[in-house]
Every structure is written in structure tokens, then in C-alpha cells.
């Protein structure tokens, strides 16, 4: 299944989303089926197959049992029947379409201003209304106090279109896991990276959760192409790469409508990440529909993020998260952040809300490296505040209160 960045887009209303052109199906083999038997059977149908994923720690996951199947173009129209046929072979545990959804980017037309003094010298901070809504002045005061000490320098991975690693307001807080991920021809990933981890109090650009570089750095794992599209295989490989390279928090500002009620492959990928100590966060989506029909936010173990505006109303585009097991809200309208080539712009979307949560989680994982996704969500939910539509947004994160609860819990 393939996804796009979750900048605000119109509702997708299509019975069968576009499929990957080079591997239309993702198939999990059962334990009784060896690869050679599978390949012989696929070859007899006139199809081709290849392994989909290569996790470093294969003993922890079933992801290494997944194969891509290339279906001839003249048979793609019969995909539902082909999936049923594969399920009836006795060789598979799971069959899913490898869907593609394309990016539609939404710049913000207006940016609410903030007059509150936050105690940092970033010159564009007055264009970041979200910092006031999140009481970031209290958060910065807490981070610079003697009460809060990082136990490690955490790593927040932005799984997206790439990140401009040379940006003036990102470079000092950026860690590269692979140079091929460190540019961003699209701009979406760089915007998300700045929300989570732009260098703060450096006299340049914008502020973020990186008040001090001691707590976390950001990195990039490129999972979306320059045109803004990527397959389910791309996203899952990105999750594997990020975790295998040591990421503590994975931020997925992407997603799309899915025909699959069971997100088995995505859920297995999230389980692989959480078993290795990481927390995975995903955008709720921007179609003003039920986020339970949107992937990968509907995968088991994922923390989902909805978007609110400066009045703490659910953003008109934000999906409703009442059926997502772990869901939170963050600002997602008129969000001002970094863009490639030392630029800055405002955008709308649950894409923008997601890295607010990811950046905060980066700080929390730094303070308590053993923090799990469920423990983190419990703290963020209990310390969050109501929006004007909490049942459909989840609680709005409050960073200072969350860190205060974390260190209080640690002290106990």
C-alpha cells in the first residue's frame, strides 16, 4: 500500500486505490511454505515474485516472510479474485494490495501570529502560533532547569520525502543515517523536520522541541519519491531502516485511504519497531473521514495524530480519531517551518501536527530511554487538554506538563 505526505487533501473516493506498478501484491508466506516452493508456484502462473523486506533482526518479526508479486497488466483488473486465489493456496497467511496514493500539497494562506515571549531568540517565532498553544515557554524553562537531565541523545527519524540536511536551522541538529536521504526535492519532509527539531535559540529561523541539542537529533529516511508518492513496501522498508539504524521515534506524516480492514503488514512493522524500543507516530489523515479507514495510522501499536486550528477546533480536513486506539491532537493549520534551501513556509495538514508529537517524544525518550509507546501515550493523554471536539481529536498535547509527569513518575 503506498502513501503520500499528509498535507491537507480532498477526500479520496475510489473503490480500489492505485497499485504499485512493480509489485501489486504483498503476500506473507505461512510457516509451512518454503521460498522455492512458492517461487515455482508463482512461476507456473506466469507471474514473478521477490522478497519484500530485509529486517536486520529477522528473529523478532515475520516481515522476512513477505514477498511482492508482480501481476501481468492484463490481469490487474481481476485483483480481488487473484487475492482470493492466493489465499486459497494454503501457502499464505496474509495477502494485501501494495497501494499507491499521491501527494497533494496544501500551503497555508494565512498564518496566525503569536505575541507571547517564549524566552528564545529565533526571529520567526512570532509566526508560530502553535508555540503559544503548547505553552512552549514553560517547556523551555523546564528543559533548561536542573530538574531535567537527558539520559541519552535520542534520534527522531522523519520518514518522508527526505530532509535538507544543510538547512541553516536544521544542520546543527541533524544526524545522517544515509547520505541519499539527506536532500528533499519535494519540501514536505524538511517542513516536518523543522517542526520537530529545528535548532532553537540560535538567532535563526524558527523554534521547535530542540531547545537544547542534548536531548535529541533528527534524521531522515526517504520513503516517498520526489513526486510525493510511495508504496506500502517503501514505507515498511523505511520503518525497518529507521529502527535498524537506531531511531527512538519514527514520525510518519503520510497516509491514505485503504481498502484493507486488517493492516497486517503495517502492524507487523510497528511491532518490529516497538519490540526494539522505538515509538511510531503517524498522521490521522486529511479527508474529514474516519481515521480507521486511513493507513498506516490504523495499524496496531501506532500513535495517531489529528490536527487542530488556533481556536482548538478540529481542522476542517482532519480525520476523526475516535476509533484509533492511541490518538492525540496537535496544531496543524498555518504551521510555519523550514523548507529546502534555507527557506520557510506555512502549511496545513495532519502532516504538520504529527512532528509536534514526535519532537516531544524525542525529548521524553531522551529522559527515559525505556519509555514504551503505551507508557508515552498514557502520559500525553493524561497531561493533555481538551479541544473543542476532543472525542474526535484526542487530547491536545501539553509538553511541559508531559515532561513534568515523566520526571515525577521517574522520581517515584
Q: What does each model-identified segment do?
A:
Residues 29-30, 97-100, 158-162, 196-199, ...:
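Active-site-proximal beta-strand/loop segments in catalytic clefts of secreted hydrolases
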Residues 1-114:
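Primarily auto-inhibitory N-terminal propeptides
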Residues 140-175, 182-232, 298-301, 311-313, ...:
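Subtilisin-like serine protease catalytic core
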Residues 60-62, 87-155, 163, 168-169, ...:
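Protease zymogen maturation seam
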Residues 194-197, 229-252:
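Substrate-binding/charge-relay-adjacent region of secreted/lumenal peptidase catalytic domains
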Residues 243-254, 264, 269, 276, ...:
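C-terminal subdomain of the subtilisin-like protease fold in secreted/lumenal serine endopeptidases
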Residues 91-93, 152-155, 214-217, 244-250, ...:
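Loop/turn elements at helix/coil->beta-strand transitions in domains of secreted/extracellular proteins
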Residues 160, 278, 294-366, 370, ...:
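Extracellular S/T/G-rich loop segment that most often corresponds to the catalytic His/Ser-adjacent loop
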